[in-house]
Amino acid sequence: MTTPQRGEVWLVDLGMAAKVRPALVISVPAGDADRALVTLVPHTTSTRGSRFEVSVPVPFLRPGAFDAQGLVTIPHAKLIRRLGRLNPIQLAQVEQGVRAWLGLPAAGQTGGA
């Protein structure tokens, strides 16, 4: 299997309740000494208007949004097939939503009191 790369969108088996859906890889590739895990932001077509839903129109996905509140880490074995890749601007938009959800500083800023 191809190693998933940050910025790629894969069709993923997230289990019975979450079903098979597209998801964006946001973790770095696992090294030889690491567990074969990948962290993803699921894509949903059932949006709720949350500020943590990031709409990124791409031709290989139905209209919807990446749900930063739905972060999940799964084994590579749950990846079904690669659907495509976001460009750097699109990836940065989703990363911004993830940082907001996790309360992390914006890119280029440092946290602190």
Regions found by a protein language model. Give the residues of each.
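Conserved functional hotspots at enzyme active or ligand-binding sites that engage polyanionic ligands
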Residues: 1-113
